[in-house]
Amino acid sequence: MKKQTVAQGALILLIAGFMNRVLGMVGRIVLTRYLGDDGVGLYMLIAPTMMLLMTLASIGLPIAIPTLISRSNVRQNRILSASFIIAMICSTLITIVLIFTAKPIAIYLLKDERTYLPLLSIGPLLFAVSLSSILKGYFQGKQNMYPTAISTFVEQLVRIALSVIFIVWLLPYGLVYAVVGTIWASFFGEVASIIILLITFLTSLRHQHTATSLKPIPLERHHFKDILAISLPATGSRLIGSFSHFLEPILVVNCLFVLGYSSEVSAKLYGAVAGFALPLLLMPTFITFAISQAIIPVISKAYARGHYERIHEQLSMALRLSFIPAGIATVLFMLFPYELMDLLFDTDSGAQYLQIMAPIFFLLYFQGILTSVLQAINKANKAMLTTLISSILKLILMTFLLQIPEINIYGLVIAILFNIVLTTGWNYWIIRHEVGYRVKVSSVILAFLCLGITYLSGAILLQNVTLPYSQLLNLLAYSCGLGLLYLLLVKLTRLLPAKQVSQLLKR
């Protein structure tokens, strides 16, 4: 099985991330155009619960398996067998709990009985996601990113196609059944992914002589302990974010219920933020994710050798590279919120939240890089503590603001932005304290200058120039023009020197 280098792996992740983001957005467009605002709101109410249950079912195996597989060729079969048993036990227990708790969650927490059937339908999906994560973890441990990228691509295609089929088939029976259909589509998408991974896995066995096999093997207690020793702490870290996300719609609907909003209106308001604005705002993160994954081994090695200047150089370049997509995306979100919403989702719901959130959300595009640096310098526990504290404060602030009639759903928006500022700022302060890295004030000023000039140019252009084309062509023309202006400004201000970029790529 062919391995990839770190740079090759990062490139594969970047390409796969881009394709998955595009397909994910296509899936979101399909959901919106077929389900409408009400359907998206209903789906977004159960989505955090679904993500929490998936986190619990996978129990940190996506992190534990690559780590253990990369360390040993002899025990790979035992690692896979033990992981499969752990995943199936967890998925079974969680599904049983879900069967008995779905009704109370729907009625008392989400305050919307329509969520009961969609919640129940999550059960089978947990088994598929767990098995898929095990197989993907195996290939990542073998440093082969192709199966993961291909299987994820196939999963997205199957999910989108079946979403359309199931929604068209079930929508006449009611909106609830159509939402259930989207979860069925996710399940069959995961099944398709598993089939691709299994075929690749079985093919790889033919080329191995001493590693993994399909023969039954005896397992001992230490095999499970080795896996759980890594997976449980990893689960704890992910649970913080998942549980915070799980509580989010519960707090929103309950606080708005106090103000007199019906469950349907609350779901629609929450869906506008979480189902329309946030997916668009998160689109550029696939680029920053690939960059953050690429710098981890380099910074980790530099930290072990005490080469702090090397860390500063790599971190500075990563932040500068992330500034390119982050900046132009922010400007476009601020200038064309209604056009983007109408073009993609055929609605203006969420456009005002997109425009308000974009300037502060800009910081999130650097948050992943800072978190990766903390992991590389063995300070992941501090990053987890930051996430925990900021999540708690976000929930407290959200609960307080949502109950103010004049603020209502904007309390969620303010709390999300507060969380981004606090987490990003805190992580930067930790890095500054640990390795002495400081962002140059001159670079910050030049960055804001580039953003400001691009935004003002776009605003003036919109006021004085009307293009005689379709909405799509107009948006593309404005975006290309502003993008070129932005890149020119970045080049003139030397925020991203070409010489340093070429040196970085050669390494």
Where are these regions (language model features)?
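Alpha-helical transmembrane segments of multi-pass membrane transport and lipid-handling proteins
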Residues: 84-108, 312-363
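Membrane-interface helix-loop junctions in multi-pass transport and translocation proteins
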Residues: 146, 157-195, 200, 381, ...
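Helix-loop junctions and terminal segments of transmembrane helices
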Residues: 58-73, 278-309, 315
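Membrane-proximal transmembrane or re-entrant/amphipathic helices at the cytosolic face
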Residues: 460-507
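Membrane-interface junctions at transmembrane-helix termini in multi-pass inner-membrane proteins
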Residues: 128-151, 359-389
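Alpha-helical transmembrane segments of multi-pass membrane proteins
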Residues: 112-134, 346-370
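Helix-terminus/linker motif at the lipid-water interface of multi-pass membrane proteins
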Residues: 22-39, 106-107, 170, 239-284, ...
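N-terminal membrane topogenesis motif
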Residues: 1-23, 218-241, 498-507
